[in-house]
Structure formats: C-alpha cells, structure tokens
Amino acid sequence: MANVAGESAETVSTQMTAVWNNFDDGSKSLEYYADVMTALGAATASSTAEISEGLQKFASVAETVGLSYEYATSALATITATTRESASVVGTALKTLFARIQGLQLGETLEDGVDLNKYSEALDKIGVSIFEANGEMKAMDDILDETAAKWDTMAKAE
C-alpha cells in the first residue's frame, strides 16, 4: 500500500494499525483493509492517506454504533471527495455525528432536546424502523441500507 499511496512504510503502518485496532473482527486480512482504501481512493477524488486520517478520528465510535469498515470508509471517501474538506474535518464531523447517535442509543437526550424517539419517528415516516423486533437498535449499516432504499421515494422536505 505504501507504494500505491505514495506514503512511507512507517506512515502506512500507523494508519493500518488504527484501522486494524478498530475494525478487525478476525474475518478479514490487513490486505483487505488496504485494498478497500486503495480502491476507494482511486474511485473518488480522495487518497488512502485522507481516508485513513479521517478514519483515525471516528473509527472507534463508528464501530460502536454498528457501522462497518466498508460503510465508514465509503462515507469518509465520498464526503471528502465531494466537499474537499480535509479528512481531519470530515472525520471529526463523523465522530460527532456517531457519538450523538451512540448517546441516543444509551438513552441520552441531547442539548437541543432531541432523543432517539425523534429520530425513530422521522425515519418511521419514510418506512424505516431503527429497531429490531426484540427492541434493540439495528446496526447503523442496516439503517443506512433501508434509508437508501427509500431515498428515491422521498420528497425534498423529508
């Protein structure tokens, strides 16, 4: 990956250690994680260095709310490529977003009065439930998949 990314082996090692520590569940190799970043960097106007820098900002929170490595890297690469904000800024924004969701999962009410019920009600209006049949909150990947499936049917105000 160092050759493809144009980074030093030391830099890539640090980046991949952060990814490995937060996303590894034993089912994928380190090469897989590197390949995903390299492919996303090539497919978007972002680099593997940007993707890994941003991931270091929010990976631990993303994993906690059930956001997979694939979704996390895709979101980061897409937002970075689209906005051209620095990966650090995008990563911090995603960390804040997912930390808020994590707090809502734990039953907190945010400073603006928003609680999980308000998010749940908004998504219910478009036919997306954030809860499993047993009352547990679904993984973020599943919520995003269901929301994406409804995207074309939503009005602009939604």
Segments (PLM) and residue ranges:
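Amphipathic alpha-helical interface segments used for oligomerization, scaffolding
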Residues: 1-158
